[in-house]
Amino acid sequence: MKMLHRSALLEQLLSSPKTLHQLPASTLVEHALQRNEGILTDSGALAVKTGLYTGRSPQDKFIVDEPMSRDSIHWGATNKPISSEVFTRLKDKVLHYLQQKEVRYASVGFAGADPSFQLPITYLNEFAWHHLFARQLFIREQAPSNNGLEPFTIISAPTFKADPSVDGTRSEAFVIISFEQRIILIGGTEYAGEMKKAIFSVMNYLLPEAGVLPMHCSANTTDEGETALFFGLSGTGKTTLSASEHRRLIGDDEHGWSEKGIFNIEGGCYAKCIGLSKESEPQIWDAIAFGAVLENVVVDPNTGKPDFKSGELTENTRAAYPLEAIPNALLPSVAGPPKAIIFLTADAFGVLPPISKLTKEQAMYHFLSGYTSKLAGTERGITQPEATFSTCFGAPFLPRKPEEYATMLGDKLENDDVQVFLVNTGWTGGSYGTGTRIKLAYTRAMVEAALQGKLDEIETVCDPIFGLYVPTHCPGVPDELLTPRRVWKDEAAYEATALQLAKQFHENFSAFPAAKDSVRLAGPRLA
């Protein structure tokens, strides 16, 4: 492992006897309980609350403006610059703050299951439960390789509150990435998901330099090597749909696509668990055992029983657990190139078909568009679904220009024989508020049919507005459900709503003037 020269203050903190290194999960649970950071549930999981911040705070995320990365960053509302001087000053304040604590936790983990692209990570935490979370989410065993990648260091101090007037932040919370110093600095927020997504942002910057497409997707495969990718924003079903009893899980959220195939960036899963039941998601249910972390799930203090139906603290309730907690997980999580790709969207308008086939040009169009709905709880201030477009189904985590990632996907689709499907896990029979959420059992049936090739010979009809190729039949799904206008009570209302969404697609796509005409024409039709 190539070691970067760290600051003397950071080295001093890491070498201090008050900093506890490489503690196992059992000891971290014990420390968390002793420090009143959480409680045990009846299944042995550690239940914690994250306070004010129950989701990511994207407005408080910054990238340090540095010469080595300046020209490669897509600066804007997502990637906001902060000066190196301001960052270093704040970093030193945080390190001095952690120095005063009675105990800190430090470990080495890794991002990237493929040895050729594995990034070493040192993570330093104020909270025992944050350290447990990171231990379960990052890869724990180093691959037998020496790829020369310099390690990144996460410094997490959730109880340190920044002063915007002094520290140059927007609020008390901050997530700052320095590619030159190889540091991720997090403070003011107890939401552990910030660590996971910051590392993903780092990998989204580093991997393209090695010819690898980083992807916000889940992935699974069969024993025969038929790999599938599931793209989609938070809450669209990536984790749920990739946890199939009939397929081997590669990972639930973050992957790389190299010339050799697919690899997981992480070593664990971070599943949404609002409404979780053993019947609907048995693998996730069983994974919530000792060593797992439950975020913001209401727990009965007398019985220790979690109430997965409750959104009292947030709709964004989460479970973090290691990949090996899934019985059929593929370990190490490396597989061949995909045979099928599924774009997941939770359509709040209720007008997109539950499943449709995409041409290569349509796949590029919908990848660039990244349409879905922001779902309650995944970000602060979101309480109802809201139509949104997130380029490459992961715009908040992309430091580079979207066109770079889209071009890479286009090249992959060109080189491999991959069938792409668009699957709507959102509403049917009406928009949000009047329609109903498509049943998970139906979505599972459609996905299984797509992956098993059962739709290959089924007749399709072209949707007159969206231009999508919709199968007329799918095993296990009512035929009328496949055509949205047939399940709306008011067809005129459907038509108006569909045209409204089509217009939003066109307005959003104006942000990609360099897109080929063949891709632009693959979108919805307004006339």
Curated annotation (Swiss-Prot):
Pfam family, one: PEPCK_ATP
Protein name: Phosphoenolpyruvate carboxykinase (ATP)
Co-factor binding comment: Binds 1 Mn(2+) ion per subunit.
InterPro entries: PEP_carboxykinase_ATP (IPR001272), PEP_carboxykinase_C (IPR013035), PEP_carboxykinase_N (IPR008210), PEPCK_ATP_CS (IPR015994)
The protein's annotated pathway: Carbohydrate biosynthesis; gluconeogenesis
Catalysis: reaction(s): oxaloacetate + ATP = phosphoenolpyruvate + ADP + CO2
GO terms, biological process: gluconeogenesis
Keyword terms: ATP-binding, Cytoplasm, Decarboxylase, Gluconeogenesis, Lyase, Manganese, Metal-binding, Nucleotide-binding
Coiled-coil annotated spans: none
Cofactor: Mn(2+)
Sites where the protein binds Mn(2+): K197, H216, D253
Residues bound to ATP: 197, 216, 232-240, 281, 318, 437-438, 443
Domain of life: Bacteria
GO CC annotation, single: cytosol
Main location: cytoplasm
